[in-house]
């Protein structure tokens, strides 16, 4: 395919147009009075959302060069979402601000490499200042505030706070659709471990790329399954019950894996295979935990058991199992309550007698998985469109809350960025590096400016007053009042703010240092052949 190439200013300006189109679409959602964006879907009703990364992923531009600029900003949003789970709109706004200011200076003759070094130094200083200003999150009220700010709903804040209290900060919290109109919290017994499906063809939901198994049997073994004949008698017996199967094994390879996948694709048998969690002796202990939780038996040579002799009675059972590419969640295992309690007691005694911090940490992880359970937030809404929007908001809020517990919180509403301006200004840089620092100084003001603009206020006036206010005081865009942001519950997780800034600076610097862009030439449209007059019959 022929390529289209642009150089220097032409290349950068085309990419900047794409950056602006995407950022201008996303940034209208920022702040408490941000608007929604409606996304057309190829099937079903349109999606109404204010989630930055969801909007960014949907944008495809006709011009190849502009589209590359837009895709780079979309990458910033996606990366921030992967790391912190929130802050994608802020990251997009920061990227646009750094690119705009940077392009002005590069066009005026500044060296982009020097600017990049200045940006990197300034961002590193800003991140350190953000961490220094952070306040740890420990109580239920603070957790609820973080979730409420992210979701724009105090009720959602209460649900997430309560869920984290019941299953622990590192506990498993999932979000499902409710059958009714009310959103509710449900805590059920369950276990999660960090192993995903061995083949993506095992998924049952192609959009979310997850496999949901209702009322499955669970085969638990520390053996490697390579020959399908070893488990064929067992599979035939399970097939008669019409129930799905989860296989937890050392590995599934050879002819066994493609055979299982083929039967899954044909619809003969709903089966998902995952590798056993942990390593060595710890793996054996975790498999035993799963067996006790689900009422099954570990098929292992230690007990003199062989796969070919396994029966349905040796299998574990659960109400539901959800498997994605990275993890498996077992909900409501059918294990005996007394056996589970005894296992928990054994692990607790091992924790008390352990002299290794590492071993103690791993034992506590096992204890949490065995006794903590899974919290399920069931989202209810009047319409499917509202339900989708609500689920996205709750997912963002949950991610933001976990980030806050991990690294602490700072003043929200963009105030935290303005509070670190003095630390960045104090950097002793010269030449193009000083220009890079000044670009970051201007970009750090942009989130507050945009939040104020979306709320109907003049951003420059808000910025000027904020710079002259004491640290911690900020502008509440929801009410138009000046308040102590943390006392008012307007807070952002440090992990979210720093991730947004770091990712924005990284991609913006790449755009500024771009000197050539290579794109595919659009294929010429094939002309429609003229109709043969003789085929027109009697049409007049």
Swiss-Prot record:
It is an enzyme of class 5 (isomerase). SUPFAM superfamilies: GroEL apical domain-like, GroEL equatorial domain-like, GroEL-intermediate domain like. It is found in: Cytoplasm. It catalyses: ATP + H2O + a folded polypeptide = ADP + phosphate + an unfolded polypeptide. PROSITE patterns: CHAPERONINS_CPN60 (PS00296). GO terms for cellular component: cytoplasm. Its EC number is 5.6.1.7. The keyword tRNA-binding does not apply. InterPro entries: Chaperonin_Cpn60_CS (IPR018370), Cpn60/GroEL (IPR001844), Cpn60/GroEL/TCP-1 (IPR002423), GroEL-like_apical_dom_sf (IPR027409), GROEL-like_equatorial_sf (IPR027413), TCP-1-like_intermed_sf (IPR027410). ATP binds at residues 29-32, 86-90, 413, 476-478, 492. Coiled coil: none annotated. Keywords: ATP-binding, Chaperone, Cytoplasm, Isomerase, Nucleotide-binding. GO terms for biological process: protein refolding. One of its GO terms (molecular function) is ATP-dependent protein folding chaperone. Together with its co-chaperonin GroES, plays an essential role in assisting protein folding. The GroEL-GroES system forms a nano-cage that allows encapsulation of the non-native substrate proteins and provides a physical environment optimized to promote and accelerate protein folding. Belongs to the chaperonin (HSP60) family. Forms a cylinder of 14 subunits composed of two heptameric rings stacked back-to-back. Interacts with the co-chaperonin GroES. This is Chaperonin GroEL. The gene is groEL.
């Amino acid at each position: 395919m022929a390529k289209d190439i642009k150089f220097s200013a032409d290349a950068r300006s085309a990419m900047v147009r794409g950056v602006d189109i995407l950022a201008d679409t996303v940034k209208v959602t920022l702040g408490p009075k941000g608007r929604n964006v409606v996304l057309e879907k190829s099937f079903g009703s349109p999606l109404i959302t204010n989630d930055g990364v969801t909007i960014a992923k949907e944008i495809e531009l006709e011009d190849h060069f502009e589209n590359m600029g837009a895709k780079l900003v979309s990458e910033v949003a996606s990366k921030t979402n992967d790391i912190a789970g929130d802050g994608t709109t802020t990251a997009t706004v920061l990227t646009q601000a750094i690119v705009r200011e940077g392009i002005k200076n590069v066009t005026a003759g500044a060296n982009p490499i020097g600017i990049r070094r200045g940006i990197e130094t300034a961002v590193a200083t800003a991140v350190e200042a953000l961490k220094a200003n952070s306040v740890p999150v420990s109580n239920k009220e603070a957790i609820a505030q973080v979730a409420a700010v992210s979701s724009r709903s105090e009720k959602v804040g209460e649900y997430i706070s309560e869920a984290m209290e019941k299953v622990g900060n590192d506990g498993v919290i999932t979000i499902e659709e409710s059958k009714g109109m009310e959103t509710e919290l449900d805590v059920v017994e369950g276990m999660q471990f960090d192993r995903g499906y061995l083949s993506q063809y095992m998924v049952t939901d192609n959009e979310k790329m997850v496999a949901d198994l209702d009322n499955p049997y669970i085969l638990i073994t520390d053996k490697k399954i390579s020959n399908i004949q070893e488990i064929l008698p067992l599979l035939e017996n399970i097939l008669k019950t019409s129930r799905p199967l989860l296989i937890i094994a050392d590995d599934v390879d050879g002819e066994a894996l493609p055979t299982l996948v083929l039967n899954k694709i044909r619809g003969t048998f709903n089966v998902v295979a995952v590798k056993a969690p942990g390593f060595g002796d710890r793996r054996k202990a975790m498999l035993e935990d799963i067996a006790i939780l689900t009422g099954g038996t570990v098929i292992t040579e230690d007990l003199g058991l062989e796969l070919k002799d396994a029966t349905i009675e040796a299998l574990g059972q659960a109400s539901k199992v959800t498997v994605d590419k990275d993890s498996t969640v077992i909900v409501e295992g059918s294990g005996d309550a007394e056996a589970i309690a005894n296992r928990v007691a054994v692990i607790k005694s091992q924790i008390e007698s352990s002299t290794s911090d590492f071993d103690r940490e791993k034992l506590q992880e096992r204890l949490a998985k065995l006794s903590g359970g899974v919290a399920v937030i069931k989202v209810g809404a009047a319409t499917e469109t509202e339900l989708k929007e609500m689920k996205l908001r709750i997912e963002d809020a949950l991610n933001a809350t976990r980030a806050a517990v991990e690294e602490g919180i700072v003043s929200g509403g963009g105030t935290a960025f303005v509070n670190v301006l003095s630390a960045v200004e104090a950097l002793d840089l010269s030449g193009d590096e000083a220009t890079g620092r000044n670009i970051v100084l201007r970009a750090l003001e942009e989130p507050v400016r945009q939040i104020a603009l979306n709320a109907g206020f003049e951003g420059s006036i808000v910025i000027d007053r904020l710079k002259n206010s004491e640290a911690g005081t900020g502008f509440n865009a929801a009410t138009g009042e000046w308040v102590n942001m943390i006392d008012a519950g307007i807070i952002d997780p440090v992990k979210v703010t720093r991730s947004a800034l770091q990712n924005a600076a990284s991609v913006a610097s790449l755009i500024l240092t771009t000197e050539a862009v290579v794109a595919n030439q659009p294929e010429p449209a094939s002309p429609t052949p003229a109709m043969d007059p003789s085929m027109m019959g009697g049409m007049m």
